[in-house]
C-alpha cells in the first residue's frame, strides 16, 4: 500500500480576510469603541437614571427641588465689563447679590441678580482661586485649587482688597492632582458642613466639619468625611460647582463636561437632573462651559459659564427683586 503525503495548502491572505470577516472585525472594533465611549461618558448610567426619573417622577417631585420643572429665563447674557473666565457662584442672602471669582487676575466680583457687575475686589496671595461660598453675614470661603487650600475671608461693604495672609486657612493634601483639585463649594448652615468638590480623576465630594472655625470658645478641630458610594453614583465626568439647598437638605452638583446639573438627596442618591444641552429646558444653545451654580431663597437658579456668560433658570417667571 502506498501512502501519499498531503501537502498543506499555502496560507491565503485572501481567504483569511474575506469581506465578510473584515466587516465582522470592523463591527467588533466599532462596538468595543462605543462601549468604552459610553462608559467614559456614563451614557448607560444616565440612560438608566432617565428611566428611573420618569418612573418615579410623581413621588420624587414632592420631596425634592425637582430640576425638570426649571426653564431658562436669561440665556447666555454677557457680563458687561468682565472679559475674564468666571469660576463658581454663590448667593448672599443678606445683600441679595451674587459673588463669583476669577483667577487671572485673582479677584472677587459682586453681581446683581440680573448679572450686572456691582464691584470687583482684588485678591492677593491666592494662586488659583476657583470657588467662593457664602457662610454667614460677611463671611466667605475661597478655594485655591492647586494647593487644595481653603481660605476664610471677611467681605464688608467697604472692603477694597483681600490678602490671604491675613485670613484663616486650611490646607488639605487629599489626592493632589495639579490643576484637577478643589473646584466647587457648598455650605450647610444648619449642619455646619462645608462640601468641597474635587474636579476629576477621580470625582469626589468631601464634607468638612470644623472649618471655617466660627466658635471662638471651642477648640479648632477639623474632620473630613467622604462617601465613595455616593461619588460612584455620580454619573458625570467632572465637577465644576456645588449648591446646598437648606429647604430639602439636597445637594446640586454641576458638571461642565457632562453639561448637567444633578440633584442628590440626603442619602447621596440622584433624584433629578437639569440638562444644559440645546433644546433642553428652553435653551436655544448648549451652555459652553458651565463653571458655577447658585440658588437664591426663592428657588431661582443662577449659572455662569466661561468666559463671561450669565444664565437664570426658574420654575415660574421670577418677579423683579
Curated annotation (Swiss-Prot):
UniProt signal peptide? 1-42
Q: Name one GO biological process term.
A: calcium ion homeostasis
Null mutant phenotype: Impairs growth at high Ca(2+) level, causing extended lag phase and decrease in growth rate. Raises the basal intracellular concentration of Ca(2+), and impairs recovery to the resting intracellular Ca(2+). Significantly alters the morphology of swarming colonies at elevated Ca(2+). Reduces pyocyanine production by 72%. Increases sensitivity to tobramycin at high Ca(2+). Reduces survival of the greater wax moth Galleria mellonella infection model, when in the presence of 10mM CaCl(2).
Q: Specify where it is mainly localized.
A: membrane
The induction annotation reads: Up-regulated by Ca(2+), with the highest induction during the transition to the stationary phase of growth. Up-regulated by an unknown molecule secreted by P.aeruginosa during stationary phase, probably an autoinducer; induction is dependent upon one or more of the quorum-sensing synthases, LasL, RhlL and PqsA. Up-regulated by Fe(2+); acts synergistically with Ca(2+). Up-regulated by UV as a part of the oxidative stress response.
Membrane topology note: Peripheral membrane protein
**Keyword annotations of the record:** Cell inner membrane, Cell membrane, Membrane, Signal
**One Gene Ontology term, aspect cellular component:** plasma membrane
Protein family membership:
Belongs to the YjiK family.
- Protein's name according to its UniProt entry: Calcium-regulated beta-propeller protein CarP
Gene responsible for this protein = carP
Amino acid at each position: 500500500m502506498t501512502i501519499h503525503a498531503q501537502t498543506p495548502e499555502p496560507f491565503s491572505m485572501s481567504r483569511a480576510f474575506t469581506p465578510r470577516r473584515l466587516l465582522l472585525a470592523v463591527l467588533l472594533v466599532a462596538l468595543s469603541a462605543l462601549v468604552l465611549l459610553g462608559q467614559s461618558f456614563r451614557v448607560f448610567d444616565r440612560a438608566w437614571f432617565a428611566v428611573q426619573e420618569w418612573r418615579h417622577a410623581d413621588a420624587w417631585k414632592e420631596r425634592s427641588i425637582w430640576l425638570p420643572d426649571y426653564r431658562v429665563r436669561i440665556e447666555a447674557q454677557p457680563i458687561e465689563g468682565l472679559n475674564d473666565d468666571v469660576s463658581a457662584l454663590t448667593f448672599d442672602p443678606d445683600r441679595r447679590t451674587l459673588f463669583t471669582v476669577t483667577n487671572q487676575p485673582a479677584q472677587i466680583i459682586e453681581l446683581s441678580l440680573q448679572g450686572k457687575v456691582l464691584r470687583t475686589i482684588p485678591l492677593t496671595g491666592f494662586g488659583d482661586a476657583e470657588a467662593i461660598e457664602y457662610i454667614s453675614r460677611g463671611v466667605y470661603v475661597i478655594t485655591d485649587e492647586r494647593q487644595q487650600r481653603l481660605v476664610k475671608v471677611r467681605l464688608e461693604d467697604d472692603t477694597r482688597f483681600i490678602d490671604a495672609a491675613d485670613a484663616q486657612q486650611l490646607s488639605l493634601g487629599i489626592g493632589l492632582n495639579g490643576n484637577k483639585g478643589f473646584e466647587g463649594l457648598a455650605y450647610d448652615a444648619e449642619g455646619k458642613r462645608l462640601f468641597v468638590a474635587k474636579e476629576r480623576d477621580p470625582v469626589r465630594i468631601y464634607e468638612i466639619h470644623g472649618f471655617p472655625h466660627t466658635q471662638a470658645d471651642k477648640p479648632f478641630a477639623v474632620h473630613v468625611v467622604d462617601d465613595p458610594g455616593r461619588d460612584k453614583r455620580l454619573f458625570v465626568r467632572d465637577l465644576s460647582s456645588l449648591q446646598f439647598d437648606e429647604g430639602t437638605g439636597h445637594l446640586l452638583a454641576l458638571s461642565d463636561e457632562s453639561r448637567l446639573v444633578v440633584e442628590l438627596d440626603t442619602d447621596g442618591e440622584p433624584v433629578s437632573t437639569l440638562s444644559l444641552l440645546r433644546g433642553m429646558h428652553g435653551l436655544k444653545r448648549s451652555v459652553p462651559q458651565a463653571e458655577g451654580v447658585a440658588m437664591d431663597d426663592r428657588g431661582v437658579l443662577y449659572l455662569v459659564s466661561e468666559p463671561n456668560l450669565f444664565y437664570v433658570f426658574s420654575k415660574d417667571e421670577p418677579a423683579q427683586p
